[in-house]
Regions:
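A conserved hydrophobic helix/loop-capping motif in glycosyltransferases and polysaccharide synthases
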Residues: 4-8, 27-28
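Conserved core of the sugar-phosphate nucleotidyltransferase
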Residues: 119-198
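A structural signal for short hydrophobic beta-strand segments in well-ordered beta-sheet cores
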Residues: 25, 153-155, 223
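Conserved beta-loop-beta/alpha segment of the NTase-like Rossmann-fold superfamily
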Residues: 67, 74-151, 155
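Conserved N-terminal catalytic core of the sugar/cofactor nucleotidyltransferase
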Residues: 2-5, 13-16, 32-108, 201
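Active-site glycine-centered loops adjacent to acidic/histidine catalytic or metal-binding residues
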Residues: 9, 115, 236
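Conserved alpha/beta core of the MobA/IspD/sugar-nucleotide pyrophosphorylase nucleotidyltransferase superfamily
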Residues: 1-3, 174-250
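Conserved beta-strand segments of alpha/beta enzyme cores
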Residues: 24, 80-82, 160, 220-222
Protein backbone atom coordinates (compact mmCIF):
# COMPACT_ATOMS: atom_id res chain seq x y z
CA UNK A 1 0.00 0.00 0.00
CA UNK A 2 1.20 3.51 -0.83
CA UNK A 3 0.13 7.07 -0.16
CA UNK A 4 -1.60 9.19 -2.81
CA UNK A 5 -2.07 12.96 -2.72
CA UNK A 6 -4.18 14.99 -5.14
CA UNK A 7 -2.13 18.18 -5.44
CA UNK A 8 -3.08 19.46 -8.89
CA UNK A 9 -5.60 22.09 -7.83
CA UNK A 10 -5.18 25.85 -8.19
CA UNK A 11 -7.09 27.10 -5.13
CA UNK A 12 -7.95 30.50 -6.57
CA UNK A 13 -9.70 31.60 -3.38
CA UNK A 14 -6.32 31.44 -1.64
CA UNK A 15 -4.61 34.12 -3.70
CA UNK A 16 -2.04 35.64 -3.52
CA UNK A 17 -0.44 32.41 -2.22
CA UNK A 18 -1.75 30.43 -5.16
CA UNK A 19 -0.54 32.89 -7.76
CA UNK A 20 2.72 30.93 -7.63
CA UNK A 21 1.86 27.76 -5.65
CA UNK A 22 -0.62 24.90 -5.89
CA UNK A 23 -3.02 24.76 -2.99
CA UNK A 24 -1.14 21.83 -1.43
CA UNK A 25 1.95 24.03 -0.96
CA UNK A 26 0.25 26.97 0.76
CA UNK A 27 2.08 27.58 4.09
CA UNK A 28 0.17 26.33 7.14
CA UNK A 29 2.86 26.62 9.83
CA UNK A 30 5.51 29.34 9.51
CA UNK A 31 8.42 29.67 11.95
CA UNK A 32 11.27 32.12 11.64
CA UNK A 33 14.36 30.56 10.09
CA UNK A 34 12.53 27.43 8.92
CA UNK A 35 10.90 26.33 5.69
CA UNK A 36 7.10 26.68 5.93
CA UNK A 37 5.08 23.56 6.71
CA UNK A 38 2.44 23.02 4.02
CA UNK A 39 -0.56 20.72 3.66
CA UNK A 40 1.65 18.41 1.61
CA UNK A 41 4.22 18.38 4.42
CA UNK A 42 1.59 17.46 6.99
CA UNK A 43 0.19 14.69 4.79
CA UNK A 44 3.62 13.22 4.02
CA UNK A 45 4.39 13.28 7.73
CA UNK A 46 1.20 11.33 8.41
CA UNK A 47 1.98 8.80 5.70
CA UNK A 48 5.53 8.27 6.94
CA UNK A 49 4.25 7.80 10.50
CA UNK A 50 2.02 4.88 9.44
CA UNK A 51 4.71 3.32 7.24
CA UNK A 52 3.63 4.53 3.80
CA UNK A 53 7.06 5.41 2.41
CA UNK A 54 6.09 5.38 -1.29
CA UNK A 55 3.81 8.28 -2.19
CA UNK A 56 2.31 9.24 -5.53
CA UNK A 57 1.43 12.92 -5.98
CA UNK A 58 -0.86 14.08 -8.78
CA UNK A 59 0.42 17.46 -9.95
CA UNK A 60 -0.91 19.98 -12.43
CA UNK A 61 -1.29 23.67 -11.59
CA UNK A 62 2.16 25.13 -10.76
CA UNK A 63 3.62 21.62 -10.88
CA UNK A 64 7.11 23.10 -10.99
CA UNK A 65 6.75 24.19 -7.36
CA UNK A 66 6.30 20.54 -6.33
CA UNK A 67 9.16 19.44 -8.58
CA UNK A 68 11.46 22.03 -6.96
CA UNK A 69 10.63 20.75 -3.46
CA UNK A 70 10.57 17.04 -4.28
CA UNK A 71 14.09 16.11 -3.14
CA UNK A 72 13.83 18.13 0.08
CA UNK A 73 10.46 16.56 0.94
CA UNK A 74 11.85 13.08 0.31
CA UNK A 75 14.77 13.76 2.64
CA UNK A 76 12.67 15.34 5.35
CA UNK A 77 10.05 12.60 5.57
CA UNK A 78 12.02 9.56 4.40
CA UNK A 79 9.63 8.94 1.52
CA UNK A 80 9.94 8.41 -2.21
CA UNK A 81 7.68 10.65 -4.29
CA UNK A 82 6.31 9.64 -7.67
CA UNK A 83 4.80 12.58 -9.58
CA UNK A 84 1.81 11.96 -11.84
CA UNK A 85 0.85 14.61 -14.39
CA UNK A 86 -2.72 15.90 -14.66
CA UNK A 87 -2.74 17.64 -18.03
CA UNK A 88 -6.17 19.19 -17.48
CA UNK A 89 -5.78 20.48 -13.92
CA UNK A 90 -6.89 24.02 -14.76
CA UNK A 91 -9.79 22.92 -16.95
CA UNK A 92 -11.36 19.84 -15.36
CA UNK A 93 -12.31 18.85 -11.82
CA UNK A 94 -10.77 16.15 -9.68
CA UNK A 95 -12.65 13.07 -10.95
CA UNK A 96 -10.15 13.24 -13.80
CA UNK A 97 -7.30 13.93 -11.39
CA UNK A 98 -7.90 10.70 -9.46
CA UNK A 99 -8.34 8.79 -12.73
CA UNK A 100 -4.86 9.98 -13.75
CA UNK A 101 -3.59 7.91 -10.80
CA UNK A 102 -5.46 4.77 -11.88
CA UNK A 103 -2.29 2.71 -12.29
CA UNK A 104 -1.11 3.28 -8.72
CA UNK A 105 -4.56 2.46 -7.33
CA UNK A 106 -3.71 -1.16 -8.14
CA UNK A 107 -1.14 -1.11 -5.33
CA UNK A 108 -3.73 -0.08 -2.77
CA UNK A 109 -3.60 3.50 -1.51
CA UNK A 110 -4.55 5.89 1.19
CA UNK A 111 -5.77 8.87 -0.80
CA UNK A 112 -5.62 12.34 0.75
CA UNK A 113 -6.85 15.55 -0.80
CA UNK A 114 -4.13 18.17 -1.13
CA UNK A 115 -6.17 20.67 0.88
CA UNK A 116 -7.17 18.62 3.93
CA UNK A 117 -5.34 19.24 7.21
CA UNK A 118 -5.95 16.31 9.55
CA UNK A 119 -4.18 14.34 12.30
CA UNK A 120 -2.46 11.00 11.68
CA UNK A 121 -5.21 9.30 13.68
CA UNK A 122 -7.29 9.47 10.48
CA UNK A 123 -4.84 7.25 8.59
CA UNK A 124 -4.59 4.96 11.61
CA UNK A 125 -8.38 4.62 11.75
CA UNK A 126 -8.54 3.69 8.06
CA UNK A 127 -5.70 1.18 8.27
CA UNK A 128 -7.42 -0.50 11.23
CA UNK A 129 -10.32 -1.43 8.93
CA UNK A 130 -8.15 -3.61 6.70
CA UNK A 131 -8.77 -7.35 6.68
CA UNK A 132 -12.55 -7.01 6.83
CA UNK A 133 -13.10 -7.40 3.10
CA UNK A 134 -13.74 -3.70 2.53
CA UNK A 135 -12.55 -2.40 -0.84
CA UNK A 136 -13.08 1.35 -0.40
CA UNK A 137 -13.38 3.03 2.99
CA UNK A 138 -14.07 6.74 3.50
CA UNK A 139 -12.94 8.69 6.56
CA UNK A 140 -16.16 10.15 7.93
CA UNK A 141 -16.76 12.94 10.45
CA UNK A 142 -19.97 12.01 12.26
CA UNK A 143 -19.56 14.69 14.95
CA UNK A 144 -19.46 17.99 13.05
CA UNK A 145 -22.60 20.05 12.53
CA UNK A 146 -23.13 19.98 8.77
CA UNK A 147 -24.05 22.82 6.42
CA UNK A 148 -24.66 23.19 2.69
CA UNK A 149 -21.04 23.24 1.41
CA UNK A 150 -19.84 19.96 2.91
CA UNK A 151 -19.42 16.66 1.02
CA UNK A 152 -22.18 14.74 2.77
CA UNK A 153 -22.61 10.98 3.00
CA UNK A 154 -25.58 8.73 3.69
CA UNK A 155 -24.39 5.34 4.90
CA UNK A 156 -26.52 2.37 5.95
CA UNK A 157 -25.27 -0.28 8.40
CA UNK A 158 -24.59 -3.50 6.54
CA UNK A 159 -24.87 -1.83 3.13
CA UNK A 160 -22.34 0.99 3.16
CA UNK A 161 -22.61 4.30 1.34
CA UNK A 162 -25.84 4.98 -0.51
CA UNK A 163 -25.26 8.64 -1.39
CA UNK A 164 -22.29 11.01 -1.44
CA UNK A 165 -22.90 14.56 -2.60
CA UNK A 166 -22.88 18.20 -1.54
CA UNK A 167 -26.44 18.51 -2.85
CA UNK A 168 -28.22 17.04 0.14
CA UNK A 169 -30.19 18.23 3.15
CA UNK A 170 -27.62 18.12 5.98
CA UNK A 171 -30.27 16.55 8.23
CA UNK A 172 -30.30 13.45 6.01
CA UNK A 173 -26.56 12.84 6.17
CA UNK A 174 -24.71 10.28 8.28
CA UNK A 175 -21.66 12.53 8.27
CA UNK A 176 -19.12 14.45 6.20
CA UNK A 177 -16.45 12.86 4.05
CA UNK A 178 -13.20 14.59 5.04
CA UNK A 179 -11.17 13.91 1.89
CA UNK A 180 -9.20 10.81 2.95
CA UNK A 181 -9.96 7.31 1.58
CA UNK A 182 -8.46 3.85 1.82
CA UNK A 183 -8.71 2.12 -1.57
CA UNK A 184 -7.69 -1.53 -1.84
CA UNK A 185 -5.98 -2.67 -5.01
CA UNK A 186 -8.81 -5.00 -6.00
CA UNK A 187 -11.13 -1.99 -6.36
CA UNK A 188 -8.81 -0.19 -8.79
CA UNK A 189 -10.20 -1.34 -12.14
CA UNK A 190 -13.86 -0.86 -11.24
CA UNK A 191 -13.20 2.52 -9.64
CA UNK A 192 -11.16 3.70 -12.63
CA UNK A 193 -14.04 2.76 -14.94
CA UNK A 194 -16.51 4.63 -12.74
CA UNK A 195 -14.25 7.71 -12.63
CA UNK A 196 -13.87 7.69 -16.41
CA UNK A 197 -17.63 7.48 -16.91
CA UNK A 198 -17.99 10.37 -14.46
CA UNK A 199 -15.62 12.86 -16.10
CA UNK A 200 -16.78 11.86 -19.58
CA UNK A 201 -20.32 12.73 -18.50
CA UNK A 202 -19.18 16.09 -17.11
CA UNK A 203 -15.51 17.06 -16.66
CA UNK A 204 -16.47 19.40 -13.80
CA UNK A 205 -17.58 16.55 -11.54
CA UNK A 206 -15.75 15.51 -8.37
CA UNK A 207 -14.13 12.14 -7.72
CA UNK A 208 -16.81 11.69 -5.06
CA UNK A 209 -19.26 11.64 -7.97
CA UNK A 210 -17.11 8.78 -9.24
CA UNK A 211 -17.63 7.03 -5.91
CA UNK A 212 -21.37 7.48 -6.40
CA UNK A 213 -21.10 6.00 -9.90
CA UNK A 214 -19.18 3.06 -8.41
CA UNK A 215 -21.99 2.53 -5.86
CA UNK A 216 -24.67 2.88 -8.55
CA UNK A 217 -22.95 0.09 -10.48
CA UNK A 218 -23.19 -2.23 -7.49
CA UNK A 219 -19.86 -1.54 -5.81
CA UNK A 220 -19.69 -1.18 -2.07
CA UNK A 221 -18.11 1.79 -0.31
CA UNK A 222 -17.74 1.67 3.47
CA UNK A 223 -17.03 4.36 6.04
CA UNK A 224 -14.90 4.69 9.16
CA UNK A 225 -15.83 7.29 11.77
CA UNK A 226 -12.79 9.37 12.72
CA UNK A 227 -14.10 10.43 16.13
CA UNK A 228 -14.04 13.91 17.60
CA UNK A 229 -10.87 15.24 15.95
CA UNK A 230 -10.04 18.67 14.56
CA UNK A 231 -9.47 18.90 10.82
CA UNK A 232 -10.21 21.36 8.03
CA UNK A 233 -10.54 21.49 4.27
CA UNK A 234 -8.76 24.65 3.11
CA UNK A 235 -10.86 26.43 0.50
CA UNK A 236 -10.33 30.08 1.49
CA UNK A 237 -8.43 32.36 3.84
CA UNK A 238 -10.80 31.71 6.76
CA UNK A 239 -10.14 27.98 6.41
CA UNK A 240 -6.41 28.66 6.24
CA UNK A 241 -6.57 30.60 9.50
CA UNK A 242 -8.35 27.65 11.13
CA UNK A 243 -5.75 25.23 9.71
CA UNK A 244 -2.95 27.32 11.20
CA UNK A 245 -4.65 27.17 14.57
CA UNK A 246 -5.24 23.43 14.67
CA UNK A 247 -2.14 22.10 12.87
CA UNK A 248 0.08 23.26 15.72
CA UNK A 249 -1.90 20.98 18.06
CA UNK A 250 -1.15 17.73 16.26
Amino acid sequence: MIGLVLAAGAGRRLRPYTDTLPKALVPVIEREGEEPTTVLDLTLGNFAHVGLKDVAVVVGYRREAVVERKAALERKYGVTLHLIENDKAEEWNNAYSLWCARDVLKEGVILANGDTVHPVSVEETLLATRGRGQRITLALDTVKQLAEEEMKVVSTPGEGVRRITKQMDPAEATGEYIGVTLIEGDAAADLADALQATFERDPQLYYEDGYQEYVNRGGRVDTAAIGDVRWVEIDNHDDLAKAREIACQY
